[in-house]
Amino acid sequence: MATQLDVQTLRSVFQSRPDILSNIERNADTPARTTLFNEIASFVYERLGSADPEDGPASKRRRIDIAQLPTHPQPNGHAHGRAPPAGLSVDVAATDPVLLELRDISVTAPQRKKYDLCFTKNFLYARASGTSVPVQGVVYPLKDIEHAFYLPVPDKSQAQYNYVLLPRDSYLPTAKQAGANSGGGLQPLEPLVFTVPAAAPKPGSVVGPSSAAAEAVSDTYSSLLHWALTTSMRSAGNHSCQLVASDPKLFHSVARQPHRPNEKAVHVKAFRGSKDGFLFFLPTGILWGFKKPILFLPLDRIVAVSYTNVLRTTFNIVVELDTDIPGEANIAIEKEIEFGMIDQEDYGGIDETYVRRHGLADRSMAEQRKAKRELVENIKKPAAGDELAGGEGDADGLTALERAQREAEQQLQDEEDEMEEDYDPGSEGDSEGEGGSSGEDDDDDEAQGDYDDEEDDEAEGLEN
């Protein structure tokens, strides 16, 4: 029996592009081509289709909501939906009504140009002024944003701020050959970076059905965008991503800024290879920007931090990463990443107030960080499925994510208790040595506790 075109699937996939459909039907003149077209249609249909059979066939849906994009089960038991490639999102995003539009925003990545930023129910995307079509490659499903940061722009005489949004699979350092093999040739989204001044939006620059609500928080661009990003991600079902800001109380450089000398710098200059950039030591990890590729190294993926090429005026930092990413075999994560030519004056601040505070100099603590991350990851999917992430808890009043956090902390406490029970004073010399070490650990624990309290206060402040 001759191979037949899967017309139903093809029409479902290309219903908005009848020209493509007609070209396929015209060129399916051999069994090999027919099979190829059917395989392409099946692949795209699986990427766009709904996992819920009650939604009906895709051909009966006028638009495909991003919430229906399938997730991919992973070997460790939880689902991790990779951010859809840019090409699959443009047509889908264009069907979503724009709720809020911010005009003339300076986008610096993935493209450097002024665009209008549009918030819809499921997307954040850029479009050229006076057009209604999203810009290819600058369309971001709100559910797939994994990290969001609010950072001052270095070396500017006037205060400006960068918003950095990192979709899944966009921020870890990958080997050069990984891009060609990842996702069957479909590339993940790049980070989104846009810049705003420390001023209020201009009249007429904020439009859309939600502009009336936005007016109440439009004292500055920052207050407006904090509100817009947080509420949009929550409305789209993204309850895990928090907007994180740099804080000079947590880390700041001792070097004086020539452009704004009265303001503490929350960054240090650092090279990655021949590219100059800036390192930000943040509550959730280390970010290097703002030249491509922007990197973010989450604390729970850092195995250890060490120092090399320590000279009189500069030194290098080497960050060793946990490259074990279940289900992401096609993404080759670099094992070590080095940042060079850091000012020697900042060595103490980086080592004492950040690296040691987070236990990054101690390889033994890497397993604890990894276990905590995996525990939270494993609970995320069931939490989303049960609609617990919106803040509704069980009988104990906790959400699933909060419960995972408590379990992780309890696990670490149990390990510490076991170590104390197994402790044998031994000889006098051993006892003295371990006693001194215990004192240092107590100091570290107190510092870590204070730091975590500040971190929680900061996150609550951003959400409010």
Swiss-Prot record:
Originating organism: Chaetomium globosum (strain ATCC 6205 / CBS 148.51 / DSM 1962 / NBRC 6347 / NRRL 1970)
Family: Belongs to the RTT106 family.
Record protein name field: Histone chaperone RTT106
Region (Disordered): 382-464
Compartment(s): Nucleus; Chromosome
Disulphide bonds in the chain: none
Biased composition (Acidic residues): 412-464
Lineage, opening ranks: Eukaryota, Fungi, Dikarya, Ascomycota, Pezizomycotina
UniProt xrefs under Gene3D superfamilies: 2.30.29.120, Pleckstrin-homology domain (PH domain)/Phosphotyrosine-binding domain (PTB)
Residue ranges that the Swiss-Prot or TrEMBL entry lists as coiled coil: none
